[in-house]
């Protein structure tokens, strides 16, 4: 039940860097809507990171796309990543425990966190499904 290899052990002992995805779906602020969708789809995570000059500018989630379509209808097709993204996405350090990442995602009602290193560089994404 409390075996380190079990789900509780994984949650308590595992670090974010051990579970993060490192093949990241990345777009730029001026990427058009259709290309954003393609990048999100190819990444298979339901998100795209908006990066410029190696800096994280925002994140686009499936929810952001749905809200944009609901609010703007067909005009959404003319939007860019900068207009769709959530600025200042939630981040977590790669050496934090996975349990902390899961707790943060539950608290913020989000499904993914951007993972950063000591230099604040983006190094991955970690997902949580409830």
Walk through the language-model features, giving the residues of each.
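The conserved cystathionine-beta-synthase
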Residues: 26-44, 69, 91-110, 115-119
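Structured cytosolic domains appended to multi-pass membrane proteins
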Residues: 89-92, 126
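YjeF_N-associated NAD(P)HX repair module
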Residues: 1-17
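Bateman (tandem CBS) regulatory domains
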Residues: 12-24, 78-89
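A short, polar/charged loop-to-alpha-helix boundary motif
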Residues: 65-79, 130
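Extended hydrophobic/aromatic segments used for targeting, binding, or gating
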Residues: 63, 69, 84, 88-90
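A glycine-centered beta-loop-beta connector
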Residues: 40-43, 48-64, 105, 113-129
